[in-house]
């Protein structure tokens, strides 16, 4: 009888220890998820930025990588990638550097089609069209004969101009990853097609699937801030060997480069 009581007490102790440990891990995950959200929210809370020229007056995170007199540069990148089943992967997007020192913004509209040669090796067919921003409008720097490309540039909007992450704090049950050695971190969430940002993407792009996407927030560098780190936002609708549909976006603040 005494042995039974001791055994029962031992089992109870182990169960309590396991439960407390489990709660500890949950709290650690919850804490890291909160840290990741706060880190991303420093930039995402600025969305939507309808007039990108407002960024000339907005400063991001500064550290020792910046020269004393450097006001910094915002680097924006938005890109849509679509590969219908069995077809080539096509991407269309834009990169823009908004230099706060010179009050000028230049970049490229970039198209690419990934094809495969007879040995199955991927071949990039990337084309860049230099652009600049004037009066909050993106315009080509050089004359472009292709009317379709001209129209795409004139109608292009960065994700930062129409996205809204006011509900970021409400995203729950994320798949959290953190590696302090790199350092790198990420949080992934299952979204619904009713999500505001998903609806915005569907309005602007011909997305050939009704499948709701996963949202991935991934970054490198110190969670508290780093000018040499990056933060990327990805919406993945379909991911496979022969079919891929995803949208990627980033807005990072970095030291300015000499022209």
Curated annotation (Swiss-Prot):
Q: Does the keyword Signal apply?
A: yes
How this chain sits in the membrane, per its record, is: Lipid-anchor
**S-diacylglycerol cysteine: lipidated where?**
23
Q: Does the keyword Cell inner membrane apply?
A: no
Q: What are the boundaries of the signal sequence?
A: 1-22
Q: What is the lineage of its organism?
A: Bacteria, Bacillati, Bacillota, Bacilli, Bacillales
Q: Which domain of life is it from?
A: Bacteria
* Family of this protein: Belongs to the staphylococcal tandem lipoprotein family.
Keywords for the protein's UniProt record, in alphabetical order: Cell membrane, Lipoprotein, Membrane, Palmitate, Signal
Q: Which InterPro entries match?
A: Csa, Csa_sf
- What PROSITE patterns does UniProt report for this protein, alphabetically? PROKAR_LIPOPROTEIN
**Annotated lipid attachment (N-palmitoyl cysteine):** 23
Write out the annotated subcellular location: Cell membrane
Q: What are the GO cellular component annotations? A: plasma membrane
**What name goes with this protein?**
Uncharacterized lipoprotein SERP2465
The cross-references to Pfam families, in alphabetical order and at most eight, read: DUF576
Q: What species was this sequence derived from?
A: Staphylococcus epidermidis (strain ATCC 35984 / DSM 28319 / BCRC 17069 / CCUG 31568 / BM 3577 / RP62A)
């Amino acid at each position: 009888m005494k042995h039974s009581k001791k055994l029962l007490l031992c089992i109870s102790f182990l169960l309590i220890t396991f439960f407390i440990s489990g709660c500890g891990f949950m709290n650690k995950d919850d804490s890291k998820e909160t840290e990741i959200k706060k880190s991303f929210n420093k930039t995402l809370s600025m969305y939507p930025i309808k007039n990108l020229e407002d960024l000339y007056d907005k400063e991001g995170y500064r550290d020792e990588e910046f020269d004393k007199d450097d006001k910094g540069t915002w680097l924006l990148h938005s890109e849509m990638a679509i590969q219908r089943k069995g077809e080539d992967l096509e991407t269309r997007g834009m990169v823009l550097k908004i230099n706060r020192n010179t009050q000028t913004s230049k970049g490229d509209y970039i198209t690419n089609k990934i094809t495969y040669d007879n040995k199955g090796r991927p071949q990039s067919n990337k084309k860049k069209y230099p652009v600049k921003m004037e009066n909050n409008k993106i315009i080509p720097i050089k004359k472009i004969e292709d009317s379709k490309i001209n129209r795409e540039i004139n109608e292009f909007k960065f994700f930062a101009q129409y996205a809204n992450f006011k509900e970021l704090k409400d995203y729950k049950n994320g798949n959290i990853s953190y590696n302090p050695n790199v350092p790198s971190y990420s949080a992934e969430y299952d979204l619904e097609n009713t999500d505001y940002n998903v609806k915005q993407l569907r309005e602007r792009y011909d997305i050939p699937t009704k499948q709701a996407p996963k949202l991935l927030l991934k970054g490198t560098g110190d969670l508290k801030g780093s000018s040499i780190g990056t933060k990327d936002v990805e919406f993945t609708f379909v991911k496979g060997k022969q079919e891929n549909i995803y949208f990627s976006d980033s807005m990072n603040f970095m030291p300015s480069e000499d022209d």
